[in-house]
């Protein structure tokens, strides 16, 4: 479905022809600009985010990479840009977070925070995947934006399945 959104040239050409809307033309031009940079990988069966990330290894060339999970909708134009700026400043991994109600922590990966380093940034000691309310170290939840080092692939490759029989990216981050 996502692949069709980006690569369905016939759809966009028909839409442009029918609507003649400059916004649609501009959107299509943006997609064309990035089309060669976008790669898709598929999991034959759902084995967790760690397994999905492992399948991208051959495409990762830089020391760090930005990972966006499509099931977390973040309505903020600058989330990835802000994360990249933090990464450049501290030369480290960066993970987005959001505050969640303590009663719902068992639905999320939860950060164990070490130290507040700026108004919005923390050092992270650990990530606990879907802890009980009693065992949750904070109410800062993992959301689908990460800047991770290429070395994560080595950890993922040797990792055994965690909760639900899946390979979790959060387990490899620890």
Language model segments and positions:
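Conserved beta-loop-beta/alpha segment of the NTase-like Rossmann-fold superfamily
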Residues: 2, 12-15, 24-113, 157-159
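A glycine-rich beta-to-alpha transition motif near the start of alpha/beta enzyme domains, typified by
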Residues: 9
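Catalytic-core segments of class I nucleotidyltransferases/pyrophosphorylases
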Residues: 66, 80, 84, 116-174
């Amino acid at each position: 479905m996502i692949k069709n959104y980006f690569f369905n040239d016939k759809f966009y050409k028909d839409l442009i022809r029918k609507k003649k809307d400059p916004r649609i033309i501009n959107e299509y031009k943006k997609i064309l600009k990035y089309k060669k940079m976008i790669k898709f990988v598929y999991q034959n069966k759902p084995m967790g985010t760690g397994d999905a990330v492992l399948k991208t290894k051959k495409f990762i060339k830089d020391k760090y990479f930005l990972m966006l999970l499509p099931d977390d909708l973040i309505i903020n134009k600058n989330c990835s840009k802000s994360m990249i700026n933090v990464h450049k400043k501290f030369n480290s991994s960066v993970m987005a977070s959001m505050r969640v109600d303590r009663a719902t922590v068992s639905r999320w990966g939860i950060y164990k925070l070490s130290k507040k380093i700026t108004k919005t940034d923390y050092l992270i000691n650990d990530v606990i995947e879907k802890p009980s309310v009693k065992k949750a170290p904070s109410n800062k939840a993992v959301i689908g934006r990460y800047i991770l080092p290429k070395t994560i692939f080595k950890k993922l490759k040797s990792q055994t399945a965690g909760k639900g029989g899946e390979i979790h990216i959060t387990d490899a981050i620890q």
